[in-house]
């Protein structure tokens, strides 16, 4: 499977994909707005094959911690800051939605890769 095909899959699922340059290779930055309007993105780091790219997306899903991410968007009183929703529950739900967006991207990639 070609990397260009994987980029098209992401773009057809509302992701914006940007190429990134690293000292040890190229990677991709996947960006998309969360339901609450956060400009959410994940970076793959360098990869050399479609399989490595898919594994990188899976790893981002495994490592994503919605609770920790939500905490970053809360002030010292537990309310949203920097444009995040005011209520803690809403911030957490938005971060959980971001986690699901990563998972859904991985599933699209896995399914497409297995069909090839």
Identify the role of each PLM range:
Residues 1-39, 114-116:
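Negatively charged, low-complexity tracts enriched in Asp/Glu with abundant Ser/Thr
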Residues 39-116:
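Intrinsically disordered, low-complexity regulatory regions enriched in serine/threonine/proline
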């Amino acid at each position: 499977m070609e990397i260009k095909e994987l980029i098209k899959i992401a773009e057809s699922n509302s992701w914006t994909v940007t190429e990134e340059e690293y000292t040890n290779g190229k990677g991709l930055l996947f960006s998309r707005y969360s339901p609450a309007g956060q400009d959410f993105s994940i970076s793959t780091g360098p990869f050399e094959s479609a399989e490595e790219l898919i594994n990188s997306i899976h790893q981002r899903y495994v490592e994503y911690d919605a609770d920790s991410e939500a905490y970053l968007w809360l002030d010292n009183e537990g309310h949203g800051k920097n444009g995040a929703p005011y209520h803690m529950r809403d911030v957490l739900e938005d971060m959980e939605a971001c986690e699901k967006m990563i998972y859904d991207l991985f599933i699209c990639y896995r399914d497409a890769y297995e069909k090839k």
